[in-house]
Structure formats: structure tokens, C-alpha cells
């Protein structure tokens, strides 16, 4: 996935880019408008929804910490960036041979630019298993 995005970014000529997963077909136009609004003042933003489940951090099969639920969100796409910023982050990750779980993580690793949270939508699910289609 990361290589595909990096290759796509080579062709982008716009100042800002929206990076979206094809596995999330239920994106609402209101979410796109909210992201576009955020880009008026930010160079990086993404859709996120609060976690409704308790999350545990685990090492070697043992729970080491339980973050406060208020601090845990689930990332969605699209994730939006100033094109030069995300392109630079992808280039650095390729040089370092690091794989991120999403594009926003690259911005966390390779810049000081804050990533703005934009409230997502529960309907914007990622379809990964057959049960997701029900």
C-alpha cells in the first residue's frame, strides 16, 4: 500500500492531496467537505472516530497498559496533506525502509507538522472480511 501511494504521489500536481482506501466505499460527501475545510488552516488532517471499545497495549502476550478510552480513536480515510509534505515523508520512509500503518504516521515520524483530527463517520467502514458486507 505504501509503495502504491508513493508512486501515485509522483504524479500529483495539486498543492493538496486526499489519500483514500478503495476498501472504504461508504464515504459521505459531508466528510469530504469537513476535510476540505480543515485544509484551509492545516497541512495534514484525517478522519477519525472515537473508540467504543477498551484498547489494551500488549507485549509478549501480557497487558502492559490500558489507555484512557477518551484518548483512543480509530483512523479512517481519506487522509489529506499538503502534497509536498506527504511526498517528502514517503521519500524519507523509503530511504529508511520503514513501513507505516497509514500516511498520517509518516507525517508523525518525519515532520513536526501536527495532524488535525476531523470527526469521521461510523458508516465509513473498511471492508476487509466477508462479514463486513452484511
Regions picked out by a protein language model, each given a short descriptive name:
Residues 1-62, 76:
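Conserved beta-loop-beta/alpha segment of the NTase-like Rossmann-fold superfamily
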Residues 51, 68-69, 121:
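A generic structural signal for well-ordered coil/turn residues at beta-strand boundaries
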Residues 73-134:
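Conserved alpha/beta core of the MobA/IspD/sugar-nucleotide pyrophosphorylase nucleotidyltransferase superfamily
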Residues 9-11, 38-39, 65-66, 98-99, ...:
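Solvent-exposed alpha-helices and their adjacent loops that cap or buttress functional pockets
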Residues 65-75:
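A recurrent flexible, glycine/aromatic-enriched loop bordering the glycosyltransferase active site
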Residues 59, 67, 90:
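Short, flexible helix/strand-to-coil boundary loops that buttress conserved ligand/catalytic motifs
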Residues 14-15, 65-66, 83-84:
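A short alpha-helix capping/helix-coil boundary motif
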Residues 33-34, 63, 95, 116:
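Residues in and immediately flanking transmembrane alpha helices
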Amino acid at each position: 500500500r505504501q509503495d502504491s501511494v508513493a508512486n501515485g504521489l509522483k504524479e500529483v500536481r495539486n498543492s493538496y492531496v486526499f489519500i483514500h482506501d478503495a476498501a472504504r466505499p461508504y464515504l459521505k460527501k459531508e466528510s469530504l467537505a469537513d476535510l476540505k475545510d480543515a485544509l484551509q488552516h492545516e497541512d495534514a488532517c484525517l478522519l477519525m472516530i472515537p473508540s467504543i471499545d477498551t484498547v489494551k497495549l500488549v507485549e509478549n502476550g501480557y497487558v502492559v497498559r490500558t489507555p484512557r478510552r477518551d484518548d483512543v480513536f480509530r483512523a479512517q480515510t481519506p487522509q489529506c496533506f499538503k502534497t509536498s509534505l506527504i511526498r517528502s515523508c514517503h521519500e524519507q520512509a523509503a530511504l529508511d525502509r520503514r513501513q507505516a500503518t497509514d500516511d498520517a504516521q509518516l507525517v508523525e515520524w518525519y515532520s513536526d507538522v501536527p495532524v488535525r483530527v476531523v470527526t469521521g463517520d461510523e458508516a465509513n467502514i473498511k471492508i476487509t472480511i466477508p462479514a463486513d458486507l452484511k
